[in-house]
From Swiss-Prot:
InterPro entries: TVP23-like. The chain crosses the membrane at residues 34-53, 54-72, 126-146, 152-172. Keywords: Acetylation, Membrane, Transmembrane, Transmembrane helix. The keyword Membrane applies. It holds the Pfam family DUF846. It comes from Homo sapiens. This is Golgi apparatus membrane protein TVP23 homolog B. Residues 1-21 are annotated as: Disordered. One of its GO terms (cellular component) is Golgi membrane. It comes from the Eukaryota. Signal peptide: none annotated. GO terms for biological process: protein secretion; vesicle-mediated transport.
Length: 205
């Protein structure tokens, strides 16, 4: 079950991530979703390997380009719609309303049982490591292709930067805005507790 809160043009939710867990909750180090964890890295790492070894794997530029783009497209869909939801309980998407206004939506998983409230720390690290490291590599490849005048490969590399950078941007924005939401909730909670305590003291006196 996913919950979402909405503002004018963005929709925020509280972050569901291992590092946001309170200290009194046990953290799970085991991988709870091995298939999702595998495919979270498989497509993006495979695209990088094909790019680096394309000269050895095939002499056809078109074949290598199509293979890399297919792997990047599969990675974009899997990370955006599956692995983020399963591994860290986050999902982002965008929709346009009837007035043509764009709305960013950030969702987090709401678990019913205490057992499922703890995100696997191992999965969280795998998720964020793969999410951040691979786009950085594509940026390096972009500069390398640019300075070595490999113009035909530049379009492929830019595709990698755009597709993987989009997921990175979406999840980081979700993370940052959700932290702000958690901060405002905590401030409101402690403010109510402070007022309640002061009100109780005034009544007893």
């Amino acid at each position: 079950m996913l919950q979402q809160d909405s503002n004018d043009d963005t929709e925020d939710v509280s972050l569901f991530d291992a590092e946001e867990e309170t200290t009194n909750r046990p953290r799970k180090a085991k991988i709870r979703h091995p298939v999702a964890s595998f495919f979270h890295l498989f497509f993006r790492v495979s695209a990088i390997i094909v790019y680096l070894l394309c000269g050895l794997l095939s002499s056809s530029f078109i074949t290598c380009m199509v293979t890399i783009i297919l792997l990047l497209s599969c990675d974009f869909w899997a990370v955006k719609n599956v692995t983020g939801r399963l591994m860290v309980g986050l999902r982002w998407w965008n929709h346009i309303d009837e007035d043509g206004k764009s709305h960013w939506v950030f969702e987090s998983r709401k678990e019913s049982s205490q057992e499922n409230k703890t995100v696997s720390e191992a999965e969280s690290r795998i998720f964020w490591l793969g999410l951040i490291a691979c786009p950085v590599l594509w940026v390096i490849f972009a500069f390398s292709a640019l300075f070595s005048f490999r113009v035909k490969w530049l379009a492929v590399v830019i595709m990698g930067v755009v597709l993987q950078g989009a997921n990175l941007y979406g999840y980081i924005r979700c993370k940052v805005r959700s932290r702000k939401h958690l901060t405002s909730m905590a401030t409101s909670y402690f403010g109510k507790q402070f007022l309640r305590q002061n009100t109780g003291d005034d009544q007893t006196s």
